[in-house]
Amino acid sequence: MAEKFESLMNIHGFDLGSRYMDLKPLGCGGNGLVFSAVDNDCDKRVAIKKIVLTDPQSVKHALREIKIIRRLDHDNIVKVFEILGPSGSQLTDDVGSLTELNSVYIVQEYMETDLANVLEQGPLLEEHARLFMYQLLRGLKYIHSANVLHRDLKPANLFINTEDLVLKIGDFGLARIMDPHYSHKGHLSEGLVTKWYRSPRLLLSPNNYTKAIDMWAAGCIFAEMLTGKTLFAGAHELEQMQLILESIPVVHEEDRQELLSVIPVYIRNDMTEPHKPLTQLLPGISREALDFLEQILTFSPMDRLTAEEALSHPYMSIYSFPMDEPISSHPFHIEDEVDDILLMDETHSHIYNWERYHDCQFSEHDWPVHNNFDIDEVQLDPRALSDVTDEEEVQVDPRKYLDGDREKYLEDPAFDTNYSTEPCWQYSDHHENKYCDLECSHTCNYKTRSSSYLDNLVWRESEVNHYYEPKLIIDLSNWKEQSKEKSDKKGKSKCERNGLVKAQIALEEASQQLAGKEREKNQGFDFDSFIAGTIQLSSQHEPTDVVDKLNDLNSSVSQLELKSLISKSVSQEKQEKGMANLAQLEALYQSSWDSQFVSGGEDCFFINQFCEVRKDEQVEKENTYTSYLDKFFSRKEDTEMLETEPVEDGKLGERGHEEGFLNNSGEFLFNKQLESIGIPQFHSPVGSPLKSIQATLTPSAMKSSPQIPHQTYSSILKHLN
């Protein structure tokens, strides 16, 4: 486990110390690499996103993401637990400290899978798609109420827990703050949304868009859940716009004129009736779902439903409950965007000295008024209708001081006399962990009674009211049993389940090791591995010492072959002497062929039994050899011993008594036997069958090993005499 952890640390540069274990790569976020790990302090699996800070631009994006995700708190948004520095160090609330780091780690809630992986298995049932779409709109309503644009909505950024069918929006790496009371034209980044989920307005004006771009992406995702494939999958921006115009009607004339000035080839006089309407692209869906989708996928963002309006659509009536669809109580404003600029360039510090416009040259009717404020109380920004949008002319929004809550925005928490920086634990043995407040019965003071991480805003309220939605009631039989089984587990706090994740990991590793041992034990002969090993050995270069030994061995074989020829000539001379002795014994045994044995005084033996014994000894001798070379050198030693012994008649007889009718190769010389036992008609004419048998069994026809000299049976015949 330690080696695996260190290898991942070295490859991907994760430096979190020993607190986190069992790192597993999950993917890449909008601006960082994401891993899952188990927190040893609380025995909980979390997702960790690493953001590398290489230049001022990356620091700006990291600051923006951290600022947004720390303030967002919703049941359909992935929760963030901690922001860590290198080696798992805790970061201070000082904004400038972020510029001194080379990387930061965002520890957030771990989700089981994402919508992209689910859709790889095929389309969803319409009821499941409606449930997920409701949760997506519910999260978007909260995000947009906080004046935040996600700008990267796609199935891969929508995370799901399959056990309870909860969907959460994640990866705010490309999100940004957009105060609706100020114009952002010309100051928005281009090409952030994934191409397949870009709205027509974003394709025409990449740096001028509103919250409606998130709603277009949500509509494309809903259609993808119903069909299992991307609704508009263009290879480039021009093809993407072409696919949209084939299915989405262009109602307003000003939109058609704008298209005519950009892509006149694809523009017709009447574009209210598309060639391939959504009814053809989405066959089989209900009429209510089609009407719901047509009101979201509109060409003009002004005609498009907002998240709040979409939740009120009749198609969502089975889930919609406005009291259970909260909005942000502390939305972002223009000064939060200015903080990013101040951090990146200290030369803009004079922006703090902006003055209000006391006298406005525009009338009150020229300005859109927010519904929550009286027209007399709202400070009008003359820049909103101006073509000049320099950052230095940005008007600070005075609405933040209208309700008299000036202490909310004090830059130093010490100015608040009612605020205590000391942690107020409910219990003396309380542990300060960032995750336990989600599952344990007591709070860990996370996001409560503490100043904001980056913007130094001190909330007046002592406690943040976390909103918890009731469980969505839906009759989905596929998940009923699983919910019942896990009800007991959810009743326990995470602290009581401490050690469960580690024990599960250890059990998985033990089972994998056991399975590997079983495979090794039951593994048979692998022909492919044998061939691969043989090819590998044959391709290797042989050492010089081995080649020299092989050459010496070949020369030894040649010398033995020469000696065998000499031994063969000696054996032929002995054979001629044995033939002469056979002539004297023709009359001794007239019917020896019919008898079962040959008698020679006290020394008598069965011929067949003798042959079998000799063959068994030969086989036993060969079985004792461990290799071909052992057998070869054993034969060589036997040959040398035979050549050193003198060949005399007396000793030859003794040797014949021991070896009988067998030569050194264990073969029986039948032609000598036929002559010695005096078979009738043996001396018949040459054409007789026995003579032909004798001709086929002559010593020249009987092949034996060249390393072993032939033997004759003269000693045996002498013994019989």
Curated annotation (Swiss-Prot):
* Family matches, as PROSITE patterns: PROTEIN_KINASE_ATP, PROTEIN_KINASE_DOM, PROTEIN_KINASE_ST
Q: Which reaction does it catalyse?
A: L-seryl-[protein] + ATP = O-phospho-L-seryl-[protein] + ADP + H(+); L-threonyl-[protein] + ATP = O-phospho-L-threonyl-[protein] + ADP + H(+)
In this protein, the active site sits at D152 (proton acceptor)
Give the start-end ranges of region Disordered. Answer: 701-721
This enzyme's EC code(s): 2.7.11.24
What does the PTM comment of the record read? Phosphorylated at Ser-189 by PAK1, PAK2 and PAK3 resulting in catalytic activation. Phosphorylated by MAPKAPK5 at other sites. Ubiquitination at Met-1 leads to degradation by the proteasome pathway.
Domain (Protein kinase): give its ranges. 20-316
One GO biological process term is: positive regulation of dendritic spine development
The keyword Cytoplasm belongs to this UniProt entry's keyword annotation: yes
User: Which SMART domains does the record associate with it?
Assistant: S_TKc
Give the motif span (SEG motif): 189-191
Q: Which cofactor(s) does the record list?
A: Mg(2+)
- Which parts of the sequence bind ATP? L26, G27, C28, G29, G30, N31, G32, L33, V34, K49
Tissue expression from the record:
Highest expression in the skeletal muscle, followed by the brain. Also found in heart, placenta, lung, liver, pancreas, kidney and skin fibroblasts.
Query: This protein's superkingdom?
Result: Eukaryota
Q: Tell me, in a sentence or two, what this protein's role is.
A: Atypical MAPK protein. Phosphorylates microtubule-associated protein 2 (MAP2) and MAPKAPK5. The precise role of the complex formed with MAPKAPK5 is still unclear, but the complex follows a complex set of phosphorylation events: upon interaction with atypical MAPKAPK5, ERK3/MAPK6 is phosphorylated at Ser-189 and then mediates phosphorylation and activation of MAPKAPK5, which in turn phosphorylates ERK3/MAPK6. May promote entry in the cell cycle.
Assembly and partners are described as: Heterodimer with ERK4/MAPK4. Interacts with (via FRIEDE motif) MAPKAPK5. Interacts with UBE3A; this interaction may be indirect and mediated by HERC2, possibly via HERC2 interaction with NEURL4.
What's the domain remark here?
A: In contrast to classical MAPKs, the TXY motif within the activation loop is replaced by the SEG motif, whose phosphorylation activates the MAP kinases.
What is the official name of this protein in its record? Mitogen-activated protein kinase 6
Output the lineage of the source organism.
Answer: Eukaryota, Metazoa, Chordata, Craniata, Vertebrata
Q: What gene name is given for the protein in this entry?
A: MAPK6
